Amino acid sequence: MIAEEWADAAAYLTLARRVQGRESAILQKMGQQEQSHMACLKGMYTLLGAGRPEIPAPQPLDRAPIGLLLRRCYGREMRCLAQYESRSSDPEYGQVFARMAQQEREHCRQILELLGSLPADK
């Protein structure tokens, strides 16, 4: 999950530089939230006594169309959402997972909104 959050954070922050206005602000905020999720997951990993996780850096984004990159992000968001929801009953970290699931759900909605507002050639 950490690697997927890192990939999403990198994608959103990169895409925020490729668009303007409201769309850029939305992507910037989503990128920051994904960075927060990544830090929380690393913190849990550390508290569980597993040390610091070794996470490979995300692949650099290609210059693919924005719509295609957002579709990839949507898939990762859905996978993370399922993982967080399944862990939301954890007695120790359940509330954290529930909050992250709520944010992932909102990211899915925002991605769909962004996809719906893109010009046909993007």
Report residues per predicted region.
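Non-heme di-metal
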Residues: 1-122
